[in-house]
Amino acid sequence: MPKYWSYPVGLAVEINNNARYGCPHHVGRKGKIIEHLHSATYDYAVSDETGDITYFKEHELTPLKGGLAYV
């Protein structure tokens, strides 16, 4: 079964409170989607404002206003 993503690569996002169990220290950080993952566990690779690259599920990310502009 093919996998579909709602958010494009390059979209500015904020890591929301749904990530508090897997990555509590990342909650509230802003970042940019850098890759779509072909994984059953995670959907996106995100580079945050500190330079960390972390994997997240779609419900753990909130798109920022301004769309594709990195914040």
Curated annotation (Swiss-Prot):
InterPro entries: YorP, YorP_sf. It holds the Pfam family YorP. It comes from the Bacteria. Signal peptide: none annotated. SUPFAM superfamilies: YorP-like (SSF159038). This is SPbeta prophage-derived uncharacterized protein YorP. It comes from Bacillus subtilis (strain 168). The gene is yorP.
